[in-house]
Amino acid sequence: MSINPITRNKIKDYLNGFIDQQLAVYSQRNLREFHDVDSYLAAISSDGDLKPFHASIIPSAIMRLNRFERSLSTGLGSTFEECARVIALDHHAVAIRSYDIHTSLDQAVWASIDLLISNIDRNNQRQIPSITEMLEKLQSIALTGIAENHVVRADLYVQRHDGSELFFEIKSPKPNKGQCLEVMQRLLRIYAIKQNSTLPTHAFYAMAYNPWGANRASYTYSIVKKYTDFTNAVVIGQEFWSLIGESSTYTELLEIYREVGLSKSSEITKKLL
């Protein structure tokens, strides 16, 4: 078992608290009931959440559930980061969320990274350069001798017991183009900062799950494949959780989510229906 009982309970407590918080926030929001067309159209919403066609055709109970599900899904991404941190602490020396690297590098390095990202942005080819190829370009540039201070943040930082480092940007498995470019820029900056480190450094775009299936080959989202080094810089589902813990971590974590979901289902249903 890769997730020990103590960590398992920590995760369950955290997820229970997360759902309680979501329910508390939702309970403070009033879903406008549809009684008749005239009264609904006469209503004013400061939040801009009036949906006359939806409210006309969809039962109010379903609308409430849908609204809660969207709210829950928005916040669910943060639970992946915290669960990864807690699990990583059982398997590695250090695990920190929102990890900041304060650094000073030559102006030319920062500018070259931005240029590489700009080239990816304008990419009309199927394959962008690999992370390794881009780092080789950075190492060959002429320096200005003028240093610039920057802070680069990683969603999750892990230091293994051998001193090697892992940096993760944990994002949606269906990002837009801008999000892909932002992650690639951050990964390149991390590698540039760590280029003289004597210990191995790896930086990844991490996806907590694969919407298309269990294996990597099933992932077909074209934007990620076009605007990231998908082969070398992206880890998905099982790959990510195995780096955090062990090969069984992904399925064990899903089982914990399922246990919490089942235990909270009656409470959620009671409050929403």
UniProtKB/Swiss-Prot annotation:
Gene giving rise to this polypeptide: hgiCIIR
Q: Which reaction does it catalyse?
A: Endonucleolytic cleavage of DNA to give specific double-stranded fragments with terminal 5'-phosphates
Which UniProt keywords are given for this protein, alphabetically ordered? Endonuclease, Hydrolase, Nuclease, Restriction system
As recorded in UniProt, its EC number(s) are: 3.1.21.4
* Originating species: Herpetosiphon aurantiacus
InterPro entries reported for this sequence? Restrct_endonuc_II_TdeIII
User: Which is an annotated GO molecular function term of this record?
Assistant: DNA binding
- Family of the protein in this entry: Belongs to the TdeIII type II restriction endonuclease family.
Taxonomy of the source species: Bacteria, Bacillati, Chloroflexota, Chloroflexia, Herpetosiphonales
- How is this protein named in the record? Type II restriction enzyme HgiCII
BP term (GO), one: DNA restriction-modification system
Give a yes or no for keyword Cytoplasm in this entry: no
| Highest rank taxon of the organism | Bacteria
